[in-house]
């Protein structure tokens, strides 16, 4: 077998949903199909998903890959079988720990590990910090999303590995999310006059949104993402924009808490929890929205941060103004006051104020989305 080939080792791969999964899949798609092999964990619905891809995907029976001897041996075997001379760890921690053995047993000559937000936790936790340093020693390059995550990770890696760090930030295909000028207004007009809705109104039809102003948050349902802050802000939003609705897409352990919070806050009728949606459906969700908001916040004394937030980039590509929480690398996705607003994700009043301004002045909001 000739030519260079890369083994991608990752837990974060569709049909599992999330920003890292989107990032890893998009990066892998950019390899020539005959130059990449993916080794990833089991996931419901994976067989149909993988069959449609132009490159091989090998699923481990485990739901989570860990750098244990069995997994490392299988990765080494795949690298030998497919003639891989490089390995890319889609998330550095913890899988990058297998880089040394992969080199010894498979002929892999180059190893690259990508960091996101959770490696900041590793960098600031003593035991995990030592393991992160080991990953830096065993790989040729560790990538980072932006300055906010680089600083703590570089300090943990040590001087030599820090000098080899390379920025690798996600991007999106603007054409995949572009909304035709005037399409949102046309959708709202059709909903008002009862005419048959067009293609971009299917999301509004599905959730019974009609012509209501829609605040969209697309994220895993966990406290860091700030869906609870959006729900707490809704009473103030509804006093100024009575027909507004909050559309939450995503799965996660916080779903039951959010439903209860919406009921206790008296805004259950204005909150739609849509569950996880396949990524190919997301352009229509963005097209159905008027504002995108994810007031993410740093938690656990700085251990838990937002790495970047690819959803902010997708929303911007769809022409939406974005409301961004000031956690980790998320501020890199917005020009405050130009393409949206940067807020303290813990400040419910500030979140409500910015949402009201965006929903009431649609011309200004649309101008932000166009920048």
Q: Across the structure, where does each feature detected by a protein language model lie?
A:
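A short, well-ordered alpha-helix in the C-terminal region of glycosyltransferases
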Residues: 243, 270, 350, 357, ...
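Short His-centered aromatic/hydrophobic patch
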Residues: 89-95
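Short hydrophobic beta-strand element within catalytic cores of glycosyltransferases
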Residues: 293, 312, 317, 321-324, ...
């Amino acid at each position: 077998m000739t030519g260079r080939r890369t083994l991608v080792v990752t837990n974060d791969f569709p049909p599992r949903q999330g920003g890292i999964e989107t990032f890893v899949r998009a990066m892998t798609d950019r390899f020539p199909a005959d130059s990449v092999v993916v080794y990833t964990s089991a996931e419901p619905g994976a067989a149909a998903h993988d069959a449609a891809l132009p490159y091989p995907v090998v699923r481990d029976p485990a739901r989570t890959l860990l750098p244990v001897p069995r997994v490392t041996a299988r990765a080494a075997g795949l690298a030998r079988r497919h003639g891989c001379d490089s390995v890319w760890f889609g998330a550095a921690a913890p899988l990058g720990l297998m880089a040394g053995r992969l080199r010894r047993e498979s002929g892999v000559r180059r190893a690259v590990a990508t960091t996101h937000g959770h490696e900041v936790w590793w960098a600031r936790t003593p035991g995990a910090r030592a393991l992160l340093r080991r990953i830096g020693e065993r790989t040729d390059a560790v990538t980072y999303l932006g300055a906010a995550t680089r600083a703590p990770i570089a300090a943990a890696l040590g001087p030599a590995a820090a000098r080899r760090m390379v920025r690798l930030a996600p991007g999106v295909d603007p054409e995949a999310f572009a909304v035709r000028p005037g399409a949102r207004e046309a959708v709202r007009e059709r909903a008002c006059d009862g005419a048959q809705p067009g293609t971009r109104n299917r999301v509004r039809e599905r959730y019974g949104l009609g012509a209501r102003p829609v605040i969209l948050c697309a994220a895993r349902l966990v406290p860091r993402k700030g869906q609870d802050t959006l729900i707490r802000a809704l009473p103030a939003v509804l006093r100024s924009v009575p027909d507004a609705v909050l559309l939450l897409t995503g799965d996660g352990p916080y779903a039951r808490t959010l439903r209860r919070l919406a009921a206790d806050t008296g805004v259950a009728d204005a909150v739609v929890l849509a569950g996880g949606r396949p990524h190919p459906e997301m352009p229509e969700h963005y097209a159905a929205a008027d504002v995108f908001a994810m007031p993410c916040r740093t938690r656990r004394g700085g251990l838990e941060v937002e790495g970047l937030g690819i959803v902010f980039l997708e929303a911007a590509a769809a022409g939406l103004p974005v409301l961004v929480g000031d956690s980790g690398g998320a501020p890199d996705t917005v020009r405050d006051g130009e393409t949206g607003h940067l807020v303290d994700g813990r400040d419910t009043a500030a979140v409500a104020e910015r949402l009201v301004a965006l929903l009431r002045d649609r011309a200004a909001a649309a101008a932000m989305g166009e920048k």
